[in-house]
Amino acid sequence: MEALVYTFLLVSTLGIIFFAIFFREPPKVPTKKMK
């Protein structure tokens, strides 16, 4: 069970870092052109 907890913590940490960078530097590509 500990492995599952460590995996969850790792994924959550990477997610927080990803969103922090994503919101700090908004994509320059308009979202309307992506679709």
Curated annotation (Swiss-Prot):
GO cellular component, one term: photosystem II reaction center
Subcellular location: Plastid, Chloroplast thylakoid membrane
Transmembrane segment boundaries: 3-23
Biological-process GO terms, alphabetical: photosynthesis
Disulfide feature: none
Top-level taxon in the UniProt lineage: Eukaryota
UniProt keyword annotations, A-Z: Chloroplast, Membrane, Photosynthesis, Photosystem II, Plastid, Thylakoid, Transmembrane, Transmembrane helix
A Pfam family reported for this protein in Swiss-Prot or TrEMBL: PsbT
InterPro entries for the chain: PSII_PsbT, PSII_PsbT_sf
Membrane topology: Single-pass membrane protein
Main location: plastid
Chain's role: Found at the monomer-monomer interface of the photosystem II (PS II) dimer, plays a role in assembly and dimerization of PSII. PSII is a light-driven water plastoquinone oxidoreductase, using light energy to abstract electrons from H(2)O, generating a proton gradient subsequently used for ATP formation.
Similarity comment: family membership: Belongs to the PsbT family.
Complex formation: PSII is composed of 1 copy each of membrane proteins PsbA, PsbB, PsbC, PsbD, PsbE, PsbF, PsbH, PsbI, PsbJ, PsbK, PsbL, PsbM, PsbT, PsbY, PsbZ, Psb30/Ycf12, at least 3 peripheral proteins of the oxygen-evolving complex and a large number of cofactors. It forms dimeric complexes.
Name of the protein: Photosystem II reaction center protein T
